[in-house]
Amino acid sequence: MRISILTIFPEMVEIVKKYGVISRAIKNGILEIEIFNLRDFTNDKHKTVDDYPFGGGPGMVMKPEPFFNFFEYYKERYGNTYTILTSPQGDRLTNHLVKELSEKESILIICGRYEGIDERVTKFVDREISIGDYVLTGGELPAMVIVDAVSRFIPDVIDKKSVEQETFNTGLLDHPHYTRPRNYKGLEVPEVLLSGDHKKIEIWRRKMALKKTMLKRPDLFLNKDLDGVDKVALLDLFRELINNAK
């Protein structure tokens, strides 16, 4: 898969290529990340990318010319590519949307700055995406979040089973995790995890995931279809709650 990013701060975005599973995926030829500097597509010697807004108001607006120049160059090089604009007014980034993006052959992410981009540039945009109901100084961090989230669903980037069991992919929050030592400052690892009984461990983990979801994100149950393991775990959890209430 190819992911392209257009930004005025390429050095900031470059860091996403250097660490962890994304770095390995690039080295293994699974993922290609290409970063473009919008200033390289300006028409003046000062490489100006912003100007004052028509109608007045605070801040600056990103000029249309560099974007149009870039898209002419990019389309000639790669053809039509699914194009995303990072924007606080865009669709909320969700697990479902991340999976949808990961199935595309290539995506292009446009990083906004200042008060925003000239509205005429949006003619090239297929989808605006927001990572939350808050405003950042620019679109570089959202672009990096999108790259990280999407790359996890690309085949062979990480273990398929790990992705399948992750929070939101199962419709539940994740269960608690433990590692050695077994006892640390009087804090014990739950005995069931040391039992070697894989069925009991699976039910315990699902029970803990259900409990955590009910307490922290009950809204997730609205879209959750409970399977057999869920029902057994939920029944076990209810029994535990009833016994504790006695």
UniProtKB/Swiss-Prot annotation:
<feature type="binding site">
    <location>
        <position position="112"/>
    </location>
    <ligand>
        <name>S-adenosyl-L-methionine</name>
    </ligand>
</feature>
<keyword id="KW-0808">Transferase</keyword>
<dbReference type="InterPro" id="IPR002649">
    <property type="entry name" value="tRNA_m1G_MeTrfase_TrmD"/>
</dbReference>
<dbReference type="InterPro" id="IPR023148">
    <property type="entry name" value="tRNA_m1G_MeTrfase_C_sf"/>
</dbReference>
<dbReference type="GO" id="GO:0052906">
    <property type="term" value="F:tRNA (guanine(37)-N1)-methyltransferase activity"/>
</dbReference>
<keyword id="KW-0819">tRNA processing</keyword>
<protein>
    <recommendedName>
        <fullName>tRNA (guanine-N(1)-)-methyltransferase</fullName>
        <ecNumber>2.1.1.228</ecNumber>
    </recommendedName>
</protein>
<dbReference type="InterPro" id="IPR029028">
    <property type="entry name" value="Alpha/beta_knot_MTases"/>
</dbReference>
<dbReference type="Pfam" id="PF01746">
    <property type="entry name" value="tRNA_m1G_MT"/>
</dbReference>
<feature type="binding site">
    <location>
        <begin position="131"/>
        <end position="136"/>
    </location>
    <ligand>
        <name>S-adenosyl-L-methionine</name>
    </ligand>
</feature>
<comment type="similarity">
    <text>Belongs to the RNA methyltransferase TrmD family.</text>
</comment>
<keyword id="KW-0963">Cytoplasm</keyword>
<comment type="subunit">
    <text>Homodimer.</text>
</comment>
<dbReference type="InterPro" id="IPR016009">
    <property type="entry name" value="tRNA_MeTrfase_TRMD/TRM10"/>
</dbReference>
<dbReference type="GO" id="GO:0005829">
    <property type="term" value="C:cytosol"/>
</dbReference>
<comment type="function">
    <text>Specifically methylates guanosine-37 in various tRNAs.</text>
</comment>
<keyword id="KW-0489">Methyltransferase</keyword>
<dbReference type="InterPro" id="IPR029026">
    <property type="entry name" value="tRNA_m1G_MTases_N"/>
</dbReference>
<keyword id="KW-0949">S-adenosyl-L-methionine</keyword>
<dbReference type="GO" id="GO:0002939">
    <property type="term" value="P:tRNA N1-guanine methylation"/>
</dbReference>
